[in-house]
Amino acid sequence: DNIRVPICEGFKRPPFDVKQGLLNSMIDHAFVERGWNSQPWVDTSKDRKSSQKGDFSIQTECGLNILVEVEFGNVASTFRDLYKFNLAYSTESYDCGIFILPDKDLAKRVDTIQNVDGARTLIEDARDSINLPLVLIGVGFDGNEIDLLTIKNDVNYWKTYKLDDFNSVIRD
């Protein structure tokens, strides 16, 4: 199943038409629906010393503990995520990580965010200091966008959304 990227022309200056908050909610919903834990502690030890949380985690049938970070934010957010992966390694809480970021084309439509190629460069530059094995995934458009104006033809509505307003959109 694919997530339809939510777009709304006019809610920001061109070319930024992707509704990032809704996209994040749709990704959250997709992971939880597939059995992943949402907002897990990065340090899972009984005497936890860190209050850091990841985006998702799961323990596979073979016992592999996986931490996921989905990042549609700026470069500083990418560094925070890389810190969380190192914390997961140092606390021996997770066996590997999955780092999901937009590809270049999607990043250009979201506004001032890091893309998967930029993150790859950061990881390669810091390869001696990133200890948790990582799978890096770039996501982009597949041509199956959802034009939010076909749901409610009111740009101002989409500019001032609340998370609760999107339950019907996320489920569809």
Locations of the language-model features?
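Short catalytic-loop micro-motif centered on adjacent basic/acidic residues
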Residues: 67-71
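Active-site metal-binding core of divalent-cation-utilizing nuclease and nuclease-like domains
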Residues: 13-17, 24-64, 74-83, 90
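Structural motif
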Residues: 65-66, 96
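Domain-level recognition of nuclease-like catalytic cores that cleave nucleotide substrates
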Residues: 104-172
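Catalytic cores of nucleic-acid endonucleases
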Residues: 72-127
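Generic surface-pattern signal
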Residues: 5-8, 28, 32, 124, ...
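Generic alpha-helical secondary structure signal
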Residues: 21, 25, 114-117
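A short, surface-exposed helix-loop junction/capping segment
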Residues: 2-14
